[in-house]
Amino acid sequence: MADYTEEDKQKVLAQLSKKTWKIPELAKILKMDKKVVKKIVQDLINEGVAGYWSSGSTTYVATKEYIEELEKKRAEG
């Protein structure tokens, strides 16, 4: 199982609050192992802090707050 520190988790969370990410892109920019990032993201989703968002063709991850902003913009057209 992929282990990570609270600092790693905070780095991921900080990026998720800025934009939507595909996990491989997020791992690359943070210079972290993709499996570790995937585990952190899954834990954040389980905690209700992050979530998945689909553009229609691609699935991304971001914080719940960022996703809500995107959905408002999408609804406004």
From Swiss-Prot:
This is Protein DsrD. InterPro entries: DsrD, WH-like_DNA-bd_sf, WH_DNA-bd_sf. The lineage of its organism: Archaea, Methanobacteriati, Methanobacteriota, Archaeoglobi, Archaeoglobales. Signal peptide: none annotated. To D.vulgaris DsvD. May play an essential role in dissimilatory sulfite reduction. It holds the Pfam family DsrD. The gene is dsrD.
